């Protein structure tokens, strides 16, 4: 059954918006030389001292989004530039101390490999997977991937969700059983340890060495990662996964949304990226399983950003999309706006089904 599209479903409007926001990264955050992007706008002394490895992995991801939307080779060139920048700034290595950082890079690099047919890039994604699998998985807290090298007993959704997604995608790409085995084993651990019976996903366990779950950290990011993991395993043949993803999506909206939007989970920084991760993987759920109510939430919430969050000629996004940006804005926050708008551009091209 197909319904009439909502006013915010015009694909040309969303394509134009996505293009404007892609270009906003250079407009507001562009930096010379190896810095590539300033961490904040406006940028002040000391703001660029942190090398935000995982933010840049998401920059790579959104450039691929732009390429898939437009087919323009310039977007692939931008993606390659970001990848090369990460490698150079990381002393030529694919690895760092944070397993989640490495997994985000692997996911983006694998998408770049798929977009370009570059087998060498696909091999880099496999190298990261093997490194994380070898050094990240252990028996603390019953299994799972550690968050970082220095805390092998601390396990969380930010490390295990991307590992499931990457493992499932590598299995789809290669057919190798080891990837699907790792995906299902990690998903079983995640569901047993951090997914509540209502579908809401907790952040982590044993951060302080006390075996406690960090229930006070309630992030859209974790919900999005679990949704993405479910969608990937559904594509691998597990028919039960889409219903679980739907349950989590609706639990996240019920618990974390206000006035139809996620209103902010901190003052920029890493938290600025969280809702973008939710939008990316919730959009994949809509494309995989229909979900008309979730589709409407994604489109309407991002429309709110464009109607209320941007003023005059400013395209800087706030963490709360109901209001214009004020003060300093991190490019992580801008990335969430770009991801959501790219998701809407993709969804607007598809019919609304029920």
Language-model features, listed with the residues they occupy:
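Second-shell loop/turn segments in exported
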Residues: 8-9, 49, 117, 175, ...
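Extended ligand-binding groove/face enriched in aromatic
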Residues: 76-170, 181-184
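Active-site cradle of extracellular carbohydrate-active enzymes
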Residues: 167-171, 179-230
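Oxyanion-binding "anion nests"
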Residues: 219-257
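Structural motif corresponding to the intra-repeat A-B loop/turn of tetratricopeptide repeats
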Residues: 70, 112, 116-119, 170, ...
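CBM-like carbohydrate-recognition segments
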Residues: 2-60, 66-104, 112-113, 131, ...
